[in-house]
From Swiss-Prot:
Biological-process GO terms, alphabetical: ribosomal large subunit assembly; ribosomal small subunit assembly; rRNA 5'-end processing
Taxonomic superkingdom: Bacteria
Matching Gene3D superfamilies: YhbY-like
One GO location term (cellular component): cytosol
Cell compartment(s), UniProt: Cytoplasm
Protein name, entry field: RNA-binding protein YhbY
SUPFAM superfamilies: YhbY-like
InterPro entries in UniProt: RNA-binding_CRM, RNA-binding_domain, RNA-binding_YhbY, YhbY-like_sf
Upper taxonomic lineage: Bacteria, Pseudomonadati, Pseudomonadota, Gammaproteobacteria, Enterobacterales
Organism: Escherichia coli (strain K12)
PROSITE patterns: CRM (PS51295)
This protein's record includes keyword RNA-binding: yes
Entry GO MF terms: preribosome binding; RNA binding
Keyword annotations: Cytoplasm, RNA-binding
Residues annotated as domain CRM: 1-97
Length: 97
């Protein structure tokens, strides 16, 4: 799913007050963490994930893996925080055209 710039801006505004729902620890990306992200996306549609790593390359690889495995859209990455969006069947968030 590709998001337009206008849609990404809308989602960034909605995500601003949110707290990270999933925190990645020193173990990195595990099956349990992926399951937690899946469950959070199913429940909320728009979530923040906190990635605890200092290395940019590692963080980029983790972000790409999360997006690939969950099928979610990468809305934004700021510092160690990733914002993900994946619509559910009943669409809780309406996107602008």
């Amino acid at each position: 799913m590709n998001l337009s710039t206008k849609q990404k801006q809308h989602l960034k505004g909605l995500a601003h007050p949110l707290k990270p729902v999933v925190l990645l620890g020193s173990n990195g990306l595990t099956e349990g963490v992926l399951a937690e992200i899946e469950q959070a996306l199913e429940h909320h549609e728009l979530i923040k994930v906190k990635i605890a790593t200092e290395d940019r390359e590692t963080k980029t690889l983790i972000v790409e893996a999360i997006v690939r495995e969950t099928g979610a859209c990468n809305v934004q990455v700021i510092g160690k925080t990733l914002v993900l969006y994946r619509p559910t069947k009943e669409r809780k968030i309406s996107l602008p055209r």
